């Protein structure tokens, strides 16, 4: 897969996230995508449930900003390391807004089919996020 195709998928998705635009998923993910996140018991199956999860995070952290720190492309797989920063200004599950700033690093491996994410494996430290919010010890 040409690197330009990968860069375009990544650009669309992260620019959308940084604008708070969940609909960017429509251009970056297949409608029947599967997204696995370490620590989440079941994968998100389909773009609808994935967008709902992302919307919850963007509501909790409306100033959420992602940067891609590193990227590797091999065949139909794209791996990248990212950093997210934001301030919890909305509820996160049962936890009310704390007003606290967070910074979290993560890793993603995407399997690309027809220039869209068909399957994603994502790992980031949810415990660190909760600690930064004062919600875990």
Question: Model-derived features: where do they sit?
Answer:
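C-terminal and inter-domain tail/linker signature
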Residues: 1-137
